[in-house]
Amino acid sequence: MFQGVYTAIITPFKNDKIDYDSYNKLLEKQIKAGVNGVVPCGTTGESPTLSHTEHAELIRETVKAVQGKIQVVAGTGSNSTREAIELTEAACKDSVDGILSVNPYYNKPTQEGLFQHFQAVAEHSSVPVMLYNIPGRTSINLQPETVFRLSEIKRIRSMKEATGDLGQMGKLISLVGNKMTVLSGDDNLTLPLLAIGGVGVVSVVSNLFPKAMVEMVKYFQDGRVIEARKIHYDFIEAFALAFMETNPIPIKAAMSWFGHCEPEIRLPLTRLSQNETSVKFKKALEVLKEKGYE
């Protein structure tokens, strides 16, 4: 089962192609920081605008680059169950450690439809499955009772919870017990979720500050709550501003500001608006760097 810090890694582009030179350096940064794993081809990795060829290649290159030093949990979700199965089978052949499967979006299935979708995906996976509940993106909420049913399926072992609803997360954890691990899908709720039984985060901010996110989670797990709380408070403004526009627009801009990639992003997403809020975001990140956070 997955626990700890998993970075929802960006996909750097250069001249509208994946920039593997920059990408491999980002992976090295993550490994050095001690994250538990990376999640390529997710929301933050701009998966909706990757071609099937790019999607498969990016997963393959990620596995090759990390050399087993950290886990690779590949995003293989789709609103077509058939396509999700195809992407999952391809990722499994490339020796990933797990798959991240998002709620089917746009077609708005019922809870029974969600159950059958994830059941079908799990049946075609040779690795553990992390469910991904993000109703703000998909317009459908995977209810705790449905997740409890899914927890009976052997391959379904974890969940990335991005509802922003701690009440729902608490109910979920109380239902699934030790059958599944629950990780935060929102950086600003990582510490609160840990306090009610969560075990980690699939983080956006860890693209830029992986070591800090690893330290915060580890401090909490070691009972050093005051130290964990300090990191959380220091990052509160950055956590909020990292979502001032649609993810991954702000984090892509931030990574380019600090020389990690080009600012290029694929339509229909556009580059970060230049205004007082973006200036505030850059300043907040610079302050964190000045404090020694990495």
UniProtKB/Swiss-Prot annotation:
SMART domains: DHDPS. Its EC number is 4.3.3.7. One of its GO terms (molecular function) is 4-hydroxy-tetrahydrodipicolinate synthase activity. Pyruvate binds at residues 44, 202. CDD domains: DHDPS. It is an enzyme of class 4 (lyase). GO terms for biological process: diaminopimelate biosynthetic process; lysine biosynthetic process via diaminopimelate. Keywords: Amino-acid biosynthesis, Cytoplasm, Diaminopimelate biosynthesis, Lyase, Lysine biosynthesis, Schiff base. It is found in: Cytoplasm. It catalyses: L-aspartate 4-semialdehyde + pyruvate = (2S,4S)-4-hydroxy-2,3,4,5-tetrahydrodipicolinate + H2O + H(+). The active site is at 132 (proton donor/acceptor), 160 (schiff-base intermediate with substrate). InterPro entries: Aldolase_TIM, DapA, DapA-like, Schiff_base-form_aldolases_AS, Schiff_base-form_aldolases_CS. GO terms for cellular component: cytosol. Transmembrane segments: none annotated. The record marks 43, 106 as: Part of a proton relay during catalysis. Pathway: Amino-acid biosynthesis; L-lysine biosynthesis via DAP pathway; (S)-tetrahydrodipicolinate from L-aspartate: step 3/4. It comes from the Bacteria. Homotetramer; dimer of dimers. NCBIfam families: dapA. Catalyzes the condensation of (S)-aspartate-beta-semialdehyde [(S)-ASA] and pyruvate to 4-hydroxy-tetrahydrodipicolinate (HTPA). Belongs to the DapA family. This is 4-hydroxy-tetrahydrodipicolinate synthase. It comes from Leptospira borgpetersenii serovar Hardjo-bovis (strain L550). The lineage of its organism: Bacteria, Pseudomonadati, Spirochaetota, Spirochaetia, Leptospirales. The gene is dapA.
